[in-house]
């Protein structure tokens, strides 16, 4: 007999990335708690190089939608997303915090942060992103993610006074899903992702 799923298991199993929101006047006070819980993550050497900015001002949300090229998204026939968000959370990466930490005396025998084959600042940023998305889903809203590769980064940094040396991983969005505008995603062939003992194709 299959055991009953835990709360966390159900949350993970039912979460999905949503990129079409509707406008809503409903308030979600729990959104205020998300930033401090998002960065409650392990960071390499306790570098604490992952930061977050929360945006709930409608004016700033609209500006971020513009800088994220939402207009081109709408022209392709998709519904509104960024501009209809109830909140946007920017995951920020401070690489210098990692380098400073690994120059300390207690890390002298560790692999230097400039030599990591997979930089831990990206590992830690991914952990923060997942925290944020699950916390959003827990409020009853739907989470989405937009990477920073197609954004006007300089303009965003200027708007939010983000220092030049800080990287923006992307936007984690929170909003009310537009269930009338669901796009049927084409099913892809299932690839084996879980392996036991050895890697098998």
Q: How would you label these PLM feature ranges?
A:
Residues 183-201:
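Phosphate/diphosphate-binding glycine-rich loops and adjacent basic-rich segments that engage nucleotide
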Residues 1-92, 197-201:
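N-terminal amphipathic, basic helical "cap/leader" segment at the start of enzyme domains
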Residues 93-97:
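Short glycine-enriched loops at secondary-structure junctions
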Residues 71, 107-108, 162-164:
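Short, hinge-like loop/turn segments at secondary-structure boundaries
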Residues 38-39, 89, 109-158:
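Small-aliphatic-rich amphipathic alpha-helix that forms the alpha element of a beta-alpha
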Residues 75, 79-88, 160-184:
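A glycine-rich helix N-cap at a beta->alpha junction
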Residues 100-108:
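Short, flexible, mixed-charge acidic loops at enzyme active sites
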């Amino acid at each position: 007999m299959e055991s009953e799923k835990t709360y966390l298991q159900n949350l993970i199993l039912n979460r999905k990335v949503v990129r079409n929101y509707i406008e809503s006047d409903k308030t979600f006070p729990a959104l205020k708690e998300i930033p401090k819980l998002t960065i409650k993550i392990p960071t390499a050497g306790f570098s604490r190089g992952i930061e977050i900015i929360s945006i709930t001002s409608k004016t700033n949300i609209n500006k971020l939608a513009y800088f994220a090229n939402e207009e081109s998204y709408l022209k392709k026939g998709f519904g509104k997303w960024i501009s209809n968000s109830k909140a946007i959370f920017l995951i920020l990466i401070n690489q210098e915090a990692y380098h400073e930490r690994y120059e300390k005396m207690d890390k002298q025998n560790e692999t230097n942060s400039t030599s990591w084959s997979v930089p831990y600042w990206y590992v830690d940023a991914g952990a923060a992103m997942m925290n944020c998305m699950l916390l959003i889903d827990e409020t009853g809203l739907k989470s989405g993610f937009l990477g920073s590769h197609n954004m006007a980064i300089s303009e965003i940094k200027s708007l939010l006074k983000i220092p030049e040396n800080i990287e923006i991983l992307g936007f984690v969005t929170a909003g009310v899903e537009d269930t009338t505008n669901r796009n049927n995603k084409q099913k892809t062939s299932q690839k084996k992702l879980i392996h036991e003992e050895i890697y098998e194709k």
